[in-house]
Amino acid sequence: GCYWKQCTFCDVGLDYISRYEITPTKHLIGQIERLIGETDRRTFHFVDEAAPPAALKSLAIALLEREVRISWWGNIRFEKAFTPDLCRLLAASGCIAVTAGLEAASDRLLVKMKKGITVDQTARVAAALREAGILVHAYLMYGFPSETVQETIDSLERVRQLFCADLVQSAFWHRFTATAHSPIGLDPQANGLRILGPDFQGFAENDLSHLHRKGQTPEGIGEGLRRSMLNFIEGRGLSMDVRAWFDINTPRPRVSSTWTNRALQKRRSDDAAVADRHCIWIGGPPVVQTQGKRARLYVPGGIKETAVTLPAPQAMWLSDLLQEGRLRSEREGSYPSWREVRRAFPGSTAEFTSFVKQPSWERIRAAGLLLV
């Protein structure tokens, strides 16, 4: 099923999509471990229509706590909740790729689709995933009711920029089809459609032929989109004017050539610390060496060791934080919250605020201290 279940083009009228039932994390981990034991396979594809960020966070923590080593991928929505730190946590648990619907890369059409996302948001989430080493496949759509050729060309230009920036590695253009169980199919007149048939013939035969009062997508658009995508995936033609992919005349894209750069500049600070987040440490055990009033904190990393020198009380506080945030199966209680971290800091609130802006803190964050 799908926890969002609002997209107007999707068959959300069907029970198997609209009735989302989340599997408890403990039960899911048990199923994974059982399948590993039965098949000796450690690659998993989670087939939810869209997996909620909170559920994936819980799954990732459980996999790491129990040291269940798998490679996995699944379907998501480009939700703001997929922060850079959450994406790093997912990658640490074995996530190698995600698929998600961008559909039409047009904010006007995304509103009409009730996707609940924006094109800028999509770029930022894709960037967080890619920085964590997770591959991104985007579902794309053209020919949505009321979509203009200009909007289609603008969408293709945004997709081109996403590929240029390596924010998306794979994608596919689907032509819009009204279906019998979608909000559009259930109320076609409200969307400017006239259904031509056929009569409903069951679950597997639910595509509806239709006409839109403003006309249909011109012939040749689909072929140009298909042609462009085949080349983009191979890294070809990314510097070309997107109009060159079409055999028919198309308008000049109105999208700024620096759209992705500007969208990413508006990113919030890397998982900006807020009171309801918790600190999780995905690195190895820290070691502190005291040197008079100062101390050197060492933390092992995947490739190289990270070391920071701090006043001894701060080094001990940070070492305690990393120990408390370590992922381990015998853990009792929750991981330290941001409020608890701030209260335990050996200094004033102003000193704490200053400390988390220092390079030493950023180095520890980069080494594996996550706020999720």
Sequence positions of predicted segments:
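Canonical Radical SAM [4Fe-4S] cluster-binding loop centered on the CxxxCxxC motif
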Residues: 1-24
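Conserved, mostly hydrophobic/aromatic
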Residues: 2, 28, 46, 100
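Hydrophobic residues within beta-strands of alpha/beta enzymes
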Residues: 10, 42-46, 98, 171
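Structured mid-domain segments that build the active-site/substrate or prosthetic-cofactor binding neighborhood
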Residues: 12, 21, 25-29, 34, ...
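Short Fe-S-cluster ligation motifs
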Residues: 30-49
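Active-site-adjacent beta->alpha loops and helix N-cap segments on the catalytic face
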Residues: 52-58
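A structural motif corresponding to the C-terminal lobe/cap of the Radical SAM core domain
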Residues: 64-71, 75-255
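Radical SAM enzyme core and accessory elements
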Residues: 209-372
